[in-house]
Structure formats: C-alpha cells, structure tokens
From Swiss-Prot:
Species lineage: Bacteria, Pseudomonadati, Pseudomonadota, Gammaproteobacteria, Alteromonadales
Function of the protein: IGPS catalyzes the conversion of PRFAR and glutamine to IGP, AICAR and glutamate. The HisF subunit catalyzes the cyclization activity that produces IGP and AICAR from PRFAR using the ammonia provided by the HisH subunit.
Record's protein name: Imidazole glycerol phosphate synthase subunit HisF
Subunit-structure text: Heterodimer of HisH and HisF.
Active site (catalytic residues): D11, D130
SUPFAM superfamilies associated with the record: Ribulose-phoshate binding barrel (SSF51366)
Family in the record: Belongs to the HisA/HisF family.
Length: 257
C-alpha cells in the first residue's frame, strides 16, 4: 500500500500567503518562504502553492518566490497560477517546482492538459478542480476563476464529467477543491470525494474542510484518497503536521514519517 500524503496548501496573493473561507474574504496569514520552511520541517510530504488571482487577472505566477522556495526546502512542491503555455510551465519547473497545477486555464482550453502531458510527462501535471455543491439541482458543478470573487463564474461542466475528461487528456493527479467546505473546518466532503474516487484512476487529493486530526483519518479511510490537503489548520497552528502523522499511524493508516 502506498503511504498517504499530507499536503499543506499556501494560497498566494500579492506576494503573501492568504486564506479565505469558501474562497472569499482572504486575509494575510504570513510570508511565503518562512511558512514553506516551517511546514517542510514539521514533516509535510509536499507543498502546493496557488497564486489565486493569476488566472483571473491574466498573468502567470511570480517566478521569483518559486526559486526562493526551492532554495529553502527539500520536499517536492507544486505551483499553480495562470499557466497557459508550455513555455510558462517550463520556466516554473526550471525555477525549481516539481509539478505544475492547472485549473482555470484548462477549463478555457482543455487541450492544454494533453500538450503539457506530452511535453513533461503525466507525473508532472496536476489538475485542480473547484467543485461547488448546488443544492437546488443536487449536483456538483465546476467553477472557474475562483481566486477573485468578482471574476468567479460557473462553467458548463459537472464535476464528475470534468474529472473523467481531464484523465482522458493526460493529467497525472487531481486536487478536488470542495468550495462549500473551504475554510470552515467542518470536515472533508466524504460523499463527494467517494463519488469522485470511483471515477478516478489517478491519485486523488482531498481539499477543503479539515478541522481536526480525525477529519484526516476519516477522509483516508472512508473516501480512500491518496493525499489530504489543508491550509487554515496548519497556518493557525491548530494541527502540527508531525503530531498529525503520529496520530494517523496510530490509527493504522500508512503514512510517511
């Protein structure tokens, strides 16, 4: 059995790490490099950085802090934000990123996934999906440009269909960002993640809702995800990553120590 992964997420805006609730009202929580170094020292398996306004503002993630992060940590990290071309992806990888993640640009141009996969290999390409549960229709829908409230829009894609589409086009991993749960620390959306798990032949990372150590245990056992991503519980020091891993190991979950 492959060991499960713990992945802190750092949302970046204007050069700082920020955190919102349900993708709104972002507040500054710290500086990029010190937080990255702290999480690496605590035992994070990898890090994910989202430049949350890059796509909405038609720019690409700032490479200067990518290189500074690469100099300071010795664990893999993934970068996302406005990546629309092979050249932009190549630059970020050259500056030290191990993976690149694409979200809104892939919705605008799904062929981007295949082109990136052809150039860099499936293992390097992560697709982020911002999924919103619409109670009126009892369905999961994909949203785009979620880093900017004014630019956010609903797409024509249902989450399950988009999960299948991105796999056909060659993604190596999927991060399912459950918007309804984001930042509220009420637990991961086990129902939705379990549904996506059945459709997902590539590694699946759960995102949105972590509030206690038990929430991590539950998502690994019940939804059978490969990794759990979280932000506010780590930023606010509610959960220490090393202690979380000890807890999960004691619960019988294969986890990297």
């Amino acid at each position: 059995m492959l060991a499960k992964r713990i992945v802190p997420c750092l949302d970046v805006k204007d050069g700082c790490v920020v955190k919102g609730v349900q993708f709104r009202n972002h507040e500054i929580v710290g500086d990029i490099v010190p937080l990255a170094a702290r999480y690496a020292a605590e035992g994070a398996d990898e890090l994910v950085f989202y430049d949350i306004t890059a796509s909405a503002h038609d720019r690409v993630v700032d490479k200067s802090w990518v290189s500074r992060v690469a100099e300071q940590i010795d664990i893999p990290f993934c970068v996302a934000g406005g990546i629309k071309t092979i050249g932009q992806a190549r630059e970020l990888l050259a500056f030290g990123a191990d993976k690149i993640s694409v979200n809104s640009p892939a919705l605008s141009d799904p062929s981007l996934i295949s082109r990136l996969q052809d150039e860099f290999g499936r293992q390097c390409i992560v697709i982020g999906i911002d999924s919103f549960y619409d109670a009126a229709s009892d369905s999961y829908k994909v949203k785009q440009f979620t880093g900017d409230e004014a630019a956010t829009k609903e797409t024509a894609w249902y989450t399950q269909d988009w999960v299948e589409e991105v796999q056909k086009r060659g993604c190596g991993e999927i991060v399912l960002n459950v918007m309804n749960q984001d930042g509220v620390r009420g637990g991961y959306d086990i129902k939705q993640l379990s549904l996506v798990r059945q459709l997902c032949d590539v590694p699946l990372i759960a995102s949105g809702g972590a509030g206690t150590m038990a929430h991590f245990r539950d998502v690994f056992i019940e939804a059978k995800v490969d990794a759990a991503l979280a932000a506010s519980v780590f930023h606010k020091a509610i959960i220490n990553i090393g202690e979380l891993k000890q807890y999960l190991a004691a619960e019988g979950i294969a986890i990297r120590q």
